[in-house]
Amino acid sequence: MTAPTLTDLTDRAREIFRLVVEGYIASGHPVGSKALAGHGSVNLSPASIRSVLQELQDAGLLAAPHTSAGRMPTEFGLRLFVDGIMQVAEPSAAERAQIERGLVAGGTIESALAAASTALSELSAGAAVVMVPKREPRLVQISFVPLSPLRALAVLVSEDGGIENRVIDLPEPVGPSALEQAGNYLTSRLHGRTLGEAAGVVRAEIAGGRSALDEASADLVQRGLVVWTQDATARPVMVVRGQANLLDETALQDIERVRQLLEELEGAEAIARVLDAAREAQATRIFIGSENRLFSLSGSSVIASPWRDGDGRVVGVVGVIGPTRLNYARVVPMVDFTAQTLGKFIGQDGFSRK
C-alpha cells in the first residue's frame, strides 16, 4: 500500500486530522469524536467523525491506543503534519529577549551555552542541548613538574591565558634536567601553534633522531603528546538543561519511556552524533521518533539547528529533545532563533573564547 499524502485526503479528513494532531500536542491525550464535534470547523455528527477517524487510522496517520480512547497521531502522521500542515509561530519579543538575556559580551563560551540552553528549555518545555566542538588553543609554554618518582604534571599555557594540567605516568624515575629539557623542547616547537598542528612535526623529529633529546626526555615528550592528543579528540563541549521538563503528568503515565529517554540523555557522545547530522543542514532539522536511532526506544523527537560564526562557518548545534508531542510550530522557530543569536553573540568582539 502506497503511503498517503495530504493531496489524498478530502478537505474534511484533512481538517479532522489537523485537529487531532493539534489536540494531542496540546494535551498529550488521544482526541475523541465528541471533542472534535465541538469545533466550529467540523460540521459533522460524531458518527461521521468516527468514520473519518477510522479512515485516517487505516491510512496509517492515526492510532487508537485503546478501543474507546480516541485517536492520536502516528510518527508518520506527525511527519505529514510537520511537513505539510504546520504553521510556525515566530518567537514573541519577550521570548527573544529571554534567549538573548544571558548572552553578554565579556562572558565565556561555556556561560553562553548554559544561558542559551536554560532559556530554550524553559520556553520549549523540553530538554535543550547546545553543542560546540572543543576548541584547540594555541600554546605559548609547556613545562613538566615532578609529582613523584613515577608521575609528572604537564602544564600547558595557551595564548588566551588558559592553563591546563595533565598527569603523566612514567615507566621509571625521571630527573629534573630531563623534565626541563622536555619542557623547553616542546615550548620551542609548539609556541604559537595548536597541539594538532605541531604533534606530527615533533614525532617525526624524535623518530628521525633530530630532536637532540636524551632518551628519558624523548620518552616524556612522547607520553605527553599521547595524553594531550587523546584529550584533544574528546567529546565536544555540550550543555544539557531542562531534563525535569520531561517529567510532566502525561509522561509519568509511561514511566518506562521517560526512564529510557533520561538514560539516553546521559550519553553525551551519542547525542553529539545525533546533532552532527544537523551540522550539515542549511536549516533546522526535525527528527521524529524512530527517524533517529538514538531516541527510537523512548519514542522522542529532536529539533536541531546549526549555528554559524561571522564567516558563515558552522561551529555548533542547538536543539530541543522531548516527546513526539512537542509543540513543533512553536519550538522550531525558537531553536532557529537561538542558533542565530548564539552565532551573533559568540562572534562579537569582547566575547571570551576561554
Swiss-Prot record:
Domain of life the protein comes from: Bacteria
GO molecular function: DNA binding
Keyword Transcription among UniProt keywords: yes
A Pfam family reported for this protein in Swiss-Prot or TrEMBL: HrcA
Keyword set, alphabetical order: Repressor, Stress response, Transcription, Transcription regulation
Presence of the UniProt keyword Repressor in the record: yes
GO biological process, one term: negative regulation of DNA-templated transcription
InterPro entries associated with the record: GAF-like_dom_sf, HrcA, HrcA_C, WH-like_DNA-bd_sf, WH_DNA-bd_sf, WHTH_transcript_rep_HrcA_IDD
Protein function: Negative regulator of class I heat shock genes (grpE-dnaK-dnaJ and groELS operons). Prevents heat-shock induction of these operons.
HAMAP family: HrcA
Family indicated by similarity: Belongs to the HrcA family.
Protein name according to UniProt: Heat-inducible transcription repressor HrcA
